[in-house]
Swiss-Prot record:
Its cofactor is Mg(2+). The keyword Glycoprotein does not apply. This is Riboflavin kinase. InterPro entries: Archaeal_Riboflavin_Kinase, RibK_CTP-dep, Riboflavin_kinase_archaeal, Riboflavin_kinase_CTP-dep, Riboflavin_kinase_dom_sf. CDP binds at G10, L11, G12, E13, G14, R15, V109, H110, L111, R112.
Length: 127
């Protein structure tokens, strides 16, 4: 399945959460790569239901009495408008401020730099 969306600025929280060691280790275990500390946000025209694609669920954890929620991850391939691509993953935290129209992607590299992406650029996600 192919999904198209536009690159948008995030809330600035992806870098913090992906950088937490328990999340980083879990993402490496589930995806096969150590994620860059940050996410790429892609805004879709319609709501996206990740559960239709059998994502892998992961549990939350606690650090110094602070609870961090689990979520779901799905391996995908991301393409820029020139056809360049990279394997990455959609991450859907159980607790998020994003709408169901916004996808958060992680990869072993800084996706904006690797694919020379700017806000409003159209990208294709292949599941």
């Amino acid at each position: 399945m192919e999904i198209f969306g536009n690159v948008v600025s995030g809330l600035g929280e992806g870098r913090f959460f992906v950088g937490l060691t328990p999340y980083k280790n879990k993402f490496k275990e589930l995806t096969g790569f150590t994620p860059f500390e940050g996410t790429l946000n892609v805004k879709l025209k319609h709501n996206f239901n990740l559960d239709e694609f059998n994502p892998i669920e992961f549990d939350g954890f606690e650090i110094d009495g602070k609870k961090y929620f689990g979520g779901k991850v799905l391996l995908v391939k991301l393409f820029d408008k020139s056809g360049h691509s990279i394997n990455c993953a959609i991450v859907a935290p159980k607790k998020t401020d994003h709408s169901k129209k916004t996808l958060e992607l992680i990869a072993p590299v800084h996706l904006r730099k690797f694919l020379s992406l700017n806000n409003s650029d159209v990208v294709k996600i292949v599941i």
